[in-house]
């Protein structure tokens, strides 16, 4: 049985939200690109997300012909931290049910993203009797283990995640590492888990001559690049400390650097992590080497990736690492922490370097190698492009559609048996 229409739940953040802002990043890209590829195949996709602005339309059709973004009331129409969204999930569920009733729609599958959406998916399943496919993107147990998110009541999150594993027909794990974490930390049924990584838009992210990209951006130094949310978990401070180490030991090399940070809300100077990083840069006397650019339109990212000598992803935890994949597709080596999905995605000494997390000295060594060995950098970039080809979105969606078709067919068979 081939699915015709899918309900995608992305409760706390919209695929249309600007990247690099509050709680926007890889998941937003994933949901957006997934919907576009499904739409191209003639599969209807309705993405349900909470209304964060009273001025947003009820239905946004700008994404693709067969893909719509539905804005649903869920608490006050403003940004809320995920844990603040939790008490409003019943309102969100009611809004989704009302929309489907008004439109006279029946969905073949519910594909939910993040733990908040999984809770809603179960409530919809009770009414619609359709299968749930779920992707966590990040796991509460993992964030709790590294000390992140404790203020966000992880017990509530972890309890809900455990329930979702029981409710769902299939769980999509981004990497074998996440598969193992689900088995180890949540005692998940291994028969439910399918490893399917996120994809990358190879038409958007492809090699551009580095000199051309640097000229178009007005960059005349060796560019080190970070792209992502500005939060402690992303460990941007490790890059700053690594640059300081290089300056102490190889000042001439450091003075030829430019470290650019893409992400964060520059309009909010009191943003805690951004303020902390700026103070660190000032204290170390690196103001002339470090530049905070704020969020950038994704259309510009290919130029920045291509202009970079290396893209650095020093996170304490990443379930996958979309930025690393985009950089690789652009032909730029990645220096990343050997954690989670990054350890799966980046091949050490082949497409970039893996270093221990929170190790500024190891990070500095990797940066220095990239800067001083241009032939090594060229080969790493060449290998990265080749590896990225296997993550083309059409290939990834082929695998996902096979899962959707399978769970839909099984659900249909079970209905007939009743």
Residue ranges and their predicted role:
Residues 1-69:
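N-terminal subdomain of nucleotide-sugar transferases
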Residues 316:
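Aromatic "clamp/platform" in nucleotide-sugar-dependent glycosyltransferases that forms part
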Residues 348-349, 353-360, 369-374:
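Conserved acidic donor-binding segment of nucleotide-sugar-dependent glycosyltransferases
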Residues 295-296, 303-308:
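Short alpha-helical donor nucleotide-sugar binding micro-motif in glycosyltransferases
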Residues 271-296:
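Nucleotide-activated donor-binding/catalytic signature segment of Leloir-type glycosyltransferases, i.e.
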């Amino acid at each position: 049985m081939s699915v015709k229409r899918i309900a995608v739940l992305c409760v706390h953040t919209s695929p249309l939200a600007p990247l690099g802002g509050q709680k926007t990043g890889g998941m937003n890209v994933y949901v957006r690109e997934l919907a576009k590829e499904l739409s191209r195949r003639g599969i209807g996709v309705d993405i349900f997300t909470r209304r964060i602005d009273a001025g947003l339309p009820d239905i946004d059709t700008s994404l693709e012909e067969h893909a719509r973004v539905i804005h649903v009331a869920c608490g006050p129409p403003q940004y809320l931290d995920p844990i603040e969204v939790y008490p409003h999930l019943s309102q969100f569920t009611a809004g989704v049910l009302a929309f489907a009733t008004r439109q006279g729609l029946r969905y073949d599958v519910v594909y939910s993203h993040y733990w908040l959406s999984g809770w809603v998916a179960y409530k919809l399943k009770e009414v619609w009797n359709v299968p749930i496919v779920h992707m966590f993107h990040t796991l509460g147990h993992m964030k709790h283990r590294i000390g992140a998110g404790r203020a966000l009541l992880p017990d509530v999150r972890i309890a809900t995640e455990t329930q979702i594993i029981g409710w769902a027909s299939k769980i999509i794990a981004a990497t074998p590492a996440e598969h193992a974490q689900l088995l180890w930390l949540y005692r998940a049924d291994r028969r439910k888990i399918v490893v399917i990584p996120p994809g990358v838009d190879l038409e958007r992210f492809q090699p551009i001559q580095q000199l051309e990209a640097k000229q178009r951006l007005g960059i005349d130094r060796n560019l080190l690049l970070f792209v992502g949310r500005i939060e402690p978990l992303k460990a941007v401070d490790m890059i700053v400390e690594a640059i300081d180490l290089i300056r102490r030991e190889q000042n001439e090399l450091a003075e030829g650097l430019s470290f650019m940070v893409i992400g964060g809300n520059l309009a909010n100077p009191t943003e805690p992590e951004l303020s902390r990083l700026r103070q660190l840069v000032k204290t170390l006397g690196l103001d002339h080497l470090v530049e905070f650019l704020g969020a950038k339109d994704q259309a510009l990212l290919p130029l920045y990736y291509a202009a970079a000598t290396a893209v650095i992803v020093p996170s304490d935890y990443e379930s996958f690492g979309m930025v690393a994949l985009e950089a690789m597709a652009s032909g730029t080596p990645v220096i990343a922490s050997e954690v989670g999905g990054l350890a799966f995605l980046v091949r050490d000494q082949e497409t970039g370097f893996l270093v221990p997390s929170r190790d500024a000295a190891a990070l500095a060594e990797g940066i220095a190698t990239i800067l001083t060995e241009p032939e090594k950098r060229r080969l790493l970039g060449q290998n990265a492009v080749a590896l990225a080809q296997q993550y083309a979105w059409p290939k990834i969606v082929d695998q996902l559609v096979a899962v959707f078709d399978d769970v839909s067919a099984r659900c249909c068979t079970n209905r007939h048996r009743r």
